[in-house]
């Protein structure tokens, strides 16, 4: 499934560009409800995974992003990963990820795994994601 930037995020992203909105810190999170992202989504459409040493991961270190101009241009973060502990079976199926703004908790983008869901059941099971955005 393609990455979805919801309609609600397009407004504040444009605001960043023209200086009418202030950027916020971002966190990437896993969702475990069987849901396909849409352009009309808000953050409450997603059920964040819980348990087994899981926590959202900050995307706020500028040095972890690489921007490449081109057609399309690319913003790519270093790979983030979650390694689950002995209680991994608490997680179960993970269908994708979503990114939120930290202060307002707005949804920024989401993506359902094309080869998922990933069934987390065993200690040391991992999910790895390389967040990337393109603009053309």
What do these predicted ranges mean?
Residues 1-95, 101-136:
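Small cysteine-rich, disulfide-bonded extracellular modules of the LU/uPAR three-finger superfamily
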């Amino acid at each position: 499934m393609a990455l979805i930037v919801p309609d609600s995020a397009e407004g504040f992203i444009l605001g960043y560009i023209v200086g009418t909105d202030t950027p916020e810190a971002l966190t990437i999170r896993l969702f475990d409800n069987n849901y396909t992202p849409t352009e009309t989504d808000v953050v409450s459409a997603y059920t964040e995974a819980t348990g087994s040493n899981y926590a959202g991961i900050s995307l706020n270190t500028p040095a972890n992003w690489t921007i490449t101009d081109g057609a399309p241009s690319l913003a790519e973060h270093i790979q983030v990963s979650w390694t689950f502990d002995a209680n991994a079976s608490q997680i179960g199926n993970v269908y994708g990820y979503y990114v939120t703004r930290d202060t307002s908790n707005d949804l920024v983008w989401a993506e359902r795994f094309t080869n998922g869901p990933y069934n987390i059941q065993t200690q040391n099971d991992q999910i790895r994601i390389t967040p990337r955005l393109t603009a053309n």
